[in-house]
Amino acid sequence: MGDTDLPCVTGVLLAAGAGKRLGRGPKALLPYRGRTLVEDAAETMLVGGCHEVVIVLGANAQAVCARANLEPYRIVVNHDWSSGMGSSYLAGDAAAHTKNHILVALVDQPGLSVTTVGRLLVSHRPGRISSAAYSSLDSPRVLRRGHPMVIDAGLRPAVASTVSGDAGARVFLRQKPWLVDLIDCSDESTGEDVDTVEQMYRLL
C-alpha cells in the first residue's frame, strides 16, 4: 500500500492530565528530546501519516499553550478533564471529521515513533480497530494491547457510546475483541507511559 492509499486519519492526542503524582505540572510539558512531550508526540503523529492532529488539553491548558509550540495543530480544551480520560477521548472524537478514522495516542507515552504510527495506518483494515501491541520480558510471545490505536470511522459512534469515566475506548475493546487487530510494535517501544517519578527521571 502506498502513501496515497492511506486512509484519511485525524490524530487525537490526549494531553489533558494534571500529572499530580509526578509533581511537575502537566505531563504534556515534561521535557523530552530537547522540547516538550506534547510537541514531540504531535509532530510524530503528523510525520507518521496523520492528515491533521487534534490535541486535547485540560489541566493548565493556557500554560501548555504558552510554553509549547502547538501552532501546526488544532487545540481542543476539555474543561471536564478531571472526570477522567473518557471525556478527553470524546472531545477529541467530536473534533474530528465524521468520515475520518482517528488515531488515538497518549501524551505520556514517550516511545511513540513515526514508524509505529505509519505501521498502524498501513495495517488498518476497514471496519476494524488497529491497536499497537507490545511484548514483555516476562512473556515475550504474548502481546499486550496498548496505544496508539486506529479506530475506523464506521466504529467511532459505537465506541463513543461506551466511553465514560477514565476508561476511554476500553469497554468497547473488551466487548468486541474480534474487531481488534493487534499490530506488534515491540521493536519500537515497550509501550510504557510515564506514571512514576522513576519513569520520569528515566525520561529526563
Curated annotation (Swiss-Prot):
Transmembrane segments: none annotated. Catalyzes the reduction of nicotine blue to its hydroquinone form. Nicotine blue is the name given to the compound formed by the autocatalytic condensation of two molecules of 2,3,6-trihydroxypyridine, an intermediate in the nicotine degradation pathway. May play a role in preventing the intracellular formation of nicotine blue semiquinone radicals, which by redox cycling would lead to the formation of toxic reactive oxygen species. Besides nicotine blue, several other quinones are reduced by nboR. This is Nicotine blue oxidoreductase. Its cofactor is FMN. It catalyses: 3,3'-bipyridine-2,2',5,5',6,6'-hexol + NADP(+) = (E)-2,2',5,5'-tetrahydroxy-6H,6'H-(3,3'-bipyridinylidene)-6,6'-dione + NADPH + 3 H(+); 3,3'-bipyridine-2,2',5,5',6,6'-hexol + NAD(+) = (E)-2,2',5,5'-tetrahydroxy-6H,6'H-(3,3'-bipyridinylidene)-6,6'-dione + NADH + 3 H(+). Homotetramer. Pfam families: NTP_transf_3. It comes from Paenarthrobacter nicotinovorans (Arthrobacter nicotinovorans). Keywords: Alkaloid metabolism, NADP, Oxidoreductase, Plasmid.
